[in-house]
Amino acid sequence: MKLSRRDFMKANAVAAAAAVAGVSAPTLAANLITSTDKTAIKWDKAPCRFCGTGCSVLVGSQDGRVVATQGDPDAPVNRGLNCIKGYFLSKIMYGEDRLTQPMLRMTNGKFDKNGDFAPVSWDQAFDIMAEKFKATLKEKGPTAVGMFGSGQWTVWEGYAAAKLMKAGFRTNNLDPNARHCMASAVVGFMRTFGMDEPMGCYDDIEQADAFVLWGSNMAEMHPILWSRMSDRRLSNPDVQVHVLSTFEHRSFELADNGMVFTPQTDLAILNYVANYIIQNDKVNWEFVNKHTQFRKGTTDIGYGLRPTHPTEARAKNPGNGDATPMSFDDFAKFVADYDLESVSKLSGVSKEKLEKLAQLYADPSKKVVSYWTMGFNQHTRGVWANNLCYNIHLLTGKISTPGSGPFSLTGQPSACGTAREVGTFAHRLPADMVVTDPKHRAIAEKIWKLPEGTIPEQVGYHAVLQNRMLKDGKLNAYWVMCNNNMQAGPNMNEEALPGYRNPANFIVVSDPYPTVTAQAADLILPTAMWVEKEGAYGNAERRTQFWHQQVKPPEGAKSDLWQLMEFAKRFKVEEVWPAELIAKQPELKGKTLFDVLYANGQVDQFPKEQSKGEFNDESESFGFYVQKGLFEEYATFGRGHGHDLAPFDQYHEARGLRWPVVDGKETLWRYREGFDPYVKAGEGVRFYGKPDGRAVIFALPYEPAAEAPDKEYDMWLSTGRVLEHWHTGTMTRRVPELYRAFPDAVLFMHPEDAKARGVRRGEEVIVSSRRGEVKTRVETRGRNRPPKGLVFMPFFDASQLVNKLTLDATDPLSKETDYKKCAVKVVKA
């Protein structure tokens, strides 16, 4: 077969990805079929199923199966390339243990919490599920039911879930697994700017003079963006890359200034940089005077542990996010304590490296982009870390302009589009609205055509609190969708598993595979995956992308959207709402939650014939274009309020659009005149999320971690991902090539630490914390190179549950878990 130049370039990209992953190029190349004139394969576009980068892929289907994928050459995000995981997308749906029937724990044909899983029909599954939810609502009320959702939900799945829980069941006990990864970014954005999500976009990469990575291993976690950054760095000798982390990883290979710091001391480093800018008269006074204000945050705010935990009990201001106005002079005095000498000593980073970092930010001629992911966010002071990074960009005016700005990268395909924008958090509604604001609740009730007072004002249980409430018997009917929280959540032994197995609780898990979470449940519902349904994701740069259903799911598997809407038919309003609420809209009497929420004259207004895809199972089932109706109703929340989304049909034609989309035009840089339609002529910059248009510069101190090494537990443990696997490995470990490339988790350890324990590379060790232990093998070489005193272990391996070890400490403001810092000991097995 003769290859075109484009095919040749793609083959080379595949070979490069294969070399990184340690698999053979021919294996990959067999999965790369590119030309429809040479095959009978049908091609269509879809965003990648994995991380939050938002790469677009072309999906090839044949005979009812996805048989090939390739990078979309017309996609502005990835420009025809995929990472190693993306090249194997065609195989994620075809694991041998794919679930195709609901499975219920039973003994002698009846539900039994301690019984074995047995197949049941969908009607039987919904019968027992509705029985348990109704009984819980009747006995204990809405606060005893809950749902744990996902940043992998499609936009309309998350929206349908939010309506069912917050309006239908009248509970805010809905939270996404994005609580574990993006909540600190959300609260950081809201505190500083009054609006969520980055102001810049990926176009910054090609225009920046320097990049600073704070707790982000982009080389493995966001490899397509890393390839664009590498191209920028290697094609221009004046471009710099600075990398900060608690251990060396692959991103250090490109670093001009690599810094390994003691865990938690990034807070001090950030304050040092701000101090350097002030001391060296590098403040952009015109910007600061026009566009910022200064506030001092409350300190000693605790660690989000149970109130009875000794560490939490010592906190003077647990969970207090208040801040008081202060002057610039007072702010300058505050950060003056973070001088070069003391911060170098505290952090373990040399003075030379710290000063080089500070000089970069302070140089007015250098355009700088700061990137971060879980190193900042999974942090007991993650909100503070986000705020302190914004301080640096605000002090220098390097923000909301091409090539300069702070940028929080996301780890899931729709953590932004679904969890954040739709508002599937326990405290949120769509478009940055919150349940605690009566005006916001009134807006939602009006759009949803609901009686006043339907949506409760109480913030629901967040992710970590949900596990605690399950254990304590206060949350009894619980639905988990599109995540594997038993493996991914913290402190599995003490908090997660006891709650799932509590006899008072009924746990439902919707998943395509029998995950660790599914195996701990009472009822498992088999779900459709990725292009087996029509979907939409929102990526890290505010880009919303759509795709059509391209193949049918296995017979018996149903999408999360279908499950949510079909389950709603099981409830009459009289069974879930008080009589006084129904009396406000008597026409709702006798109707089901499906009628009220999804057949309300808005969601069901578009005929199913408008769907352009070859398949649309949900629309066929319900008789109207479900996805379009849900999206257009949802989009009402943000239009005219800085969260504008384009009309539904426009997204199917485009490779995504970055909101706000006004008059058909997307926005690349927010808050800047000439780019953002919400900034008027003459304003220059306006942070319109704040009433006065001014962003906040916060005075926030260094505070220690919730748990640190001591004499018995003498090492730091950090967890995370590797290139070849995604999160808990539910999909990637079922791809043979990816499994072979990295089959089992290992403990990355400094050679001298291993030697001191009498352990050689490849030997088994037992890693234990105050909460549990796991057995694994030691790796003293390779991609991750921890300093002495710290070990790193990925969490993708279901046979080595590293979250038996982790502490369920959270940022008290965002409630996001700190997976990067707990104390362990390592002994030879």
Curated annotation (Swiss-Prot):
<dbReference type="InterPro" id="IPR006656">
    <property type="entry name" value="Mopterin_OxRdtase"/>
</dbReference>
<dbReference type="GO" id="GO:0009325">
    <property type="term" value="C:nitrate reductase complex"/>
</dbReference>
<dbReference type="InterPro" id="IPR009010">
    <property type="entry name" value="Asp_de-COase-like_dom_sf"/>
</dbReference>
<dbReference type="InterPro" id="IPR027467">
    <property type="entry name" value="MopterinOxRdtase_cofactor_BS"/>
</dbReference>
<feature type="binding site">
    <location>
        <position position="533"/>
    </location>
    <ligand>
        <name>Mo-bis(molybdopterin guanine dinucleotide)</name>
    </ligand>
</feature>
<dbReference type="GO" id="GO:0043546">
    <property type="term" value="F:molybdopterin cofactor binding"/>
</dbReference>
<comment type="similarity">
    <text>Belongs to the prokaryotic molybdopterin-containing oxidoreductase family. NasA/NapA/NarB subfamily.</text>
</comment>
<feature type="binding site">
    <location>
        <begin position="264"/>
        <end position="266"/>
    </location>
    <ligand>
        <name>Mo-bis(molybdopterin guanine dinucleotide)</name>
    </ligand>
</feature>
<dbReference type="InterPro" id="IPR041957">
    <property type="entry name" value="CT_Nitrate-R-NapA-like"/>
</dbReference>
<comment type="function">
    <text>Catalytic subunit of the periplasmic nitrate reductase complex NapAB. Receives electrons from NapB and catalyzes the reduction of nitrate to nitrite.</text>
</comment>
<feature type="binding site">
    <location>
        <position position="374"/>
    </location>
    <ligand>
        <name>Mo-bis(molybdopterin guanine dinucleotide)</name>
    </ligand>
</feature>
<feature type="binding site">
    <location>
        <position position="795"/>
    </location>
    <ligand>
        <name>substrate</name>
    </ligand>
</feature>
<keyword id="KW-0534">Nitrate assimilation</keyword>
<feature type="binding site">
    <location>
        <position position="378"/>
    </location>
    <ligand>
        <name>Mo-bis(molybdopterin guanine dinucleotide)</name>
    </ligand>
</feature>
<feature type="binding site">
    <location>
        <position position="55"/>
    </location>
    <ligand>
        <name>[4Fe-4S] cluster</name>
    </ligand>
</feature>
<keyword id="KW-0479">Metal-binding</keyword>
<feature type="binding site">
    <location>
        <position position="83"/>
    </location>
    <ligand>
        <name>[4Fe-4S] cluster</name>
    </ligand>
</feature>
<feature type="binding site">
    <location>
        <position position="85"/>
    </location>
    <ligand>
        <name>Mo-bis(molybdopterin guanine dinucleotide)</name>
    </ligand>
</feature>
<keyword id="KW-0813">Transport</keyword>
<dbReference type="GO" id="GO:0030151">
    <property type="term" value="F:molybdenum ion binding"/>
</dbReference>
<dbReference type="Pfam" id="PF00384">
    <property type="entry name" value="Molybdopterin"/>
</dbReference>
<dbReference type="GO" id="GO:0042597">
    <property type="term" value="C:periplasmic space"/>
</dbReference>
<feature type="binding site">
    <location>
        <position position="820"/>
    </location>
    <ligand>
        <name>Mo-bis(molybdopterin guanine dinucleotide)</name>
    </ligand>
</feature>
<dbReference type="InterPro" id="IPR019546">
    <property type="entry name" value="TAT_signal_bac_arc"/>
</dbReference>
<keyword id="KW-0004">4Fe-4S</keyword>
<feature type="binding site">
    <location>
        <position position="803"/>
    </location>
    <ligand>
        <name>Mo-bis(molybdopterin guanine dinucleotide)</name>
    </ligand>
</feature>
<feature type="binding site">
    <location>
        <begin position="245"/>
        <end position="249"/>
    </location>
    <ligand>
        <name>Mo-bis(molybdopterin guanine dinucleotide)</name>
    </ligand>
</feature>
<feature type="domain" description="4Fe-4S Mo/W bis-MGD-type">
    <location>
        <begin position="41"/>
        <end position="97"/>
    </location>
</feature>
<dbReference type="Pfam" id="PF01568">
    <property type="entry name" value="Molydop_binding"/>
</dbReference>
<dbReference type="GO" id="GO:0042128">
    <property type="term" value="P:nitrate assimilation"/>
</dbReference>
<comment type="subunit">
    <text>Component of the periplasmic nitrate reductase NapAB complex composed of NapA and NapB.</text>
</comment>
<dbReference type="GO" id="GO:0045333">
    <property type="term" value="P:cellular respiration"/>
</dbReference>
<keyword id="KW-0408">Iron</keyword>
<dbReference type="GO" id="GO:0009055">
    <property type="term" value="F:electron transfer activity"/>
</dbReference>
<dbReference type="GO" id="GO:0005506">
    <property type="term" value="F:iron ion binding"/>
</dbReference>
<dbReference type="InterPro" id="IPR006657">
    <property type="entry name" value="MoPterin_dinucl-bd_dom"/>
</dbReference>
<dbReference type="GO" id="GO:0050140">
    <property type="term" value="F:nitrate reductase (cytochrome) activity"/>
</dbReference>
<dbReference type="InterPro" id="IPR006963">
    <property type="entry name" value="Mopterin_OxRdtase_4Fe-4S_dom"/>
</dbReference>
<dbReference type="Pfam" id="PF04879">
    <property type="entry name" value="Molybdop_Fe4S4"/>
</dbReference>
<feature type="binding site">
    <location>
        <position position="152"/>
    </location>
    <ligand>
        <name>Mo-bis(molybdopterin guanine dinucleotide)</name>
    </ligand>
</feature>
<feature type="binding site">
    <location>
        <position position="48"/>
    </location>
    <ligand>
        <name>[4Fe-4S] cluster</name>
    </ligand>
</feature>
<feature type="binding site">
    <location>
        <begin position="510"/>
        <end position="511"/>
    </location>
    <ligand>
        <name>Mo-bis(molybdopterin guanine dinucleotide)</name>
    </ligand>
</feature>
